[in-house]
């Protein structure tokens, strides 16, 4: 990751109370899936988790590693749905790690472990049946090295499932170069926008088995739901913003978060959701590795 500490400050060290009031019930800080008939963020979160586990071909009893677990939506879902599995979740955020541990204790879940560690320094002697990652690789730059590490951590018949947001044909960096780069400066320093095909060019150690695409409209609806929840909770959230950003900057940061959700919604809605989308990929180890 180019600037992991900066990305942490921008997103993941913001108090959990903000995300608890802004995200859905499972605190999924990534794209939800709004299939026909779903009209609530809670339902859309759950459907996205179900689809991810189905595509990752997870079965009860497996050893699972999640890279970049966020607020634990997938980690906790897997721990509940696959009670005989053993799950290790990696996060570089202390506040996220503490939240997941506390939630797991409250739900009497004993089949998961959360490690608070920088992905750049993480290593593991353990081997896993499944490795999963949801919107973490967008914060990383050296994908070939990461794919090699993932391959090493997989058992011979293991699988790697990756969920990323992406542009339909162009990969680009988020860099703070001038006054127009407010999203890079305040929300996504050091990040990248992959292209949908980018993972397919990195198959020295992993081989693609299957891939799927979600229309960008799913992310548009997700971001607009976050915005609505945030606006609805303004009275409760305002003291938190003053405590986090200081009274002099609370209003500016309130508007920045609103603009961030609005800008992302419009981005993924562009061209009827066919320009920026979400990609799902299932990899296996290359034969002989």
What is each of the regions a protein language model found here?
Residues 1-20:
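N-terminal auxiliary segments of SAM/dcSAM-dependent transferases
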Residues 61-70:
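Conserved class I S-adenosyl-L-methionine
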Residues 71-83:
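Conserved SAM-binding loop of SAM-dependent methyltransferases across substrates and taxa
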Residues 120-131:
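A short acidic, Gly/Pro-enriched loop at the edge of an enzyme's catalytic core
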Residues 144-159:
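A short glycine-rich, Lys/Arg-flanked "PGG" loop and its adjoining helix->strand segment in the class I
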Residues 166-168, 172-278, 284-287:
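Substrate-binding/catalytic lobe of Class I Rossmann-like enzymes that use SAM or dcSAM, i.e.
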């Amino acid at each position: 990751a180019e600037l992991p500490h900066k990305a942490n400050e921008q997103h993941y060290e913001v108090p959990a109370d903000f995300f608890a009031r802004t995200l859905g019930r499972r605190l999924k800080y990534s794209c939800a899936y709004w299939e026909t008939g779903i009209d609530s963020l809670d339902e859309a979160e759950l459907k996205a988790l179900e689809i991810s586990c189905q595509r990752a071909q997870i079965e009860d009893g497996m050893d699972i590693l999640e890279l970049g677990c966020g607020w634990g939506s997938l980690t906790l879902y897997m721990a509940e749905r696959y009670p005989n599995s053993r799950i290790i979740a990696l996060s570089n955020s202390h506040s996220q790690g503490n939240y997941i541990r506390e939630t797991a204790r409250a739900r009497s879940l004993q089949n998961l472990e959360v490690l608070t560690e920088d992905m750049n320094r993480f290593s593991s002697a353990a081997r896993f049946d499944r490795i999963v990652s949801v919107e973490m690789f967008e914060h990383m730059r050296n994908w070939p090295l990461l794919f090699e590490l993932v391959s090493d951590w997989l058992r011979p018949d293991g699988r790697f499932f990756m969920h990323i947001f992406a542009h339909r044909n162009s990969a680009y960096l988020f860099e703070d170069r001038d006054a127009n780069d407010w999203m890079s400066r305040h929300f996504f320093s050091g990040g990248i926008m992959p292209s949908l095909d980018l993972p397919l060019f990195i198959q020295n150690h992993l081989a693609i088995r299957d891939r799927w695409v979600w229309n960008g409209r799913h992310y548009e609806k997700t971001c607009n739901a976050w915005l609505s929840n945030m606006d609805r909770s303004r009275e409760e959230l305002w003291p938190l913003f003053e405590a986090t950003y200081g009274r002099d900057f609370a209003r500016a940061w309130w508007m920045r978060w609103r603009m961030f959700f609005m800008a992302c919604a419009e981005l993924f809605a562009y061209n009827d959701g066919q320009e920026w989308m979400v990609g799902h990929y299932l990899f296996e180890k290359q034969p002989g590795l």
